[in-house]
């Protein structure tokens, strides 16, 4: 009887402990976008403060030319539509990143570096293996599209 009590106590401990160790939800279509805060020279950005608005969150890397092309295309579309655009570079070389933002004539106020101390969990929360990934987040904070094309963005967001 005593061994059953110990076994039962161990089972309850494992059950309740494992429920506390769940990983953040994967950033995929239909899931709630992991919230974060990040800053740049223009100020702070908090995803939780964007409720009620469409947000296009783009991660890019200097090592991936296509992500740089996507970044420029997303920026031009966001400027002409009802989308709040946020671009996060995941490279460690912030000097080169700053130069590329200037060369590509990107709106610096929408450009962020993942090297910011507040943003260290963003890469993990969004399960980024590469820098070329973008998320369209709806006004309720739900991910509607991953790596959307420009046509998809136009169809999914109000103009």
Feature locations, PLM:
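Conserved redox-active cysteine motifs that mediate thiol-disulfide chemistry
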Residues: 51-74
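Bacterial Sec-dependent N-terminal signal peptides
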Residues: 1-27
């Amino acid at each position: 009887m005593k061994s059953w009590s110990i076994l039962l106590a161990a089972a309850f401990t494992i059950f309740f402990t494992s429920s506390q160790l769940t990983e953040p939800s994967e950033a995929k279509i239909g899931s709630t976008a992991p919230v974060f805060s990040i800053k740049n020279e223009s100020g702070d950005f908090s995803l939780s403060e964007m409720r009620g608005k469409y947000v296009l969150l783009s991660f890019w890397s200097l090592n991936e030319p296509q992500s740089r092309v996507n970044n420029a295309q997303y920026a031009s579309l966001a400027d002409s539509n009802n989308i709040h655009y946020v671009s996060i570079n995941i490279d460690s070389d912030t000097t080169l990143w700053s130069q590329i933002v200037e060369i590509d004539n990107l709106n610096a106020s929408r450009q962020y570096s993942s090297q910011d101390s507040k943003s260290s969990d963003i890469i993990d929360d969004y399960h980024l293996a590469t820098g070329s990934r973008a998320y369209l987040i709806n006004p309720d904070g739900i991910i509607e599209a991953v790596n959307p094309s420009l046509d998809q963005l136009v169809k999914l967001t109000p103009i």
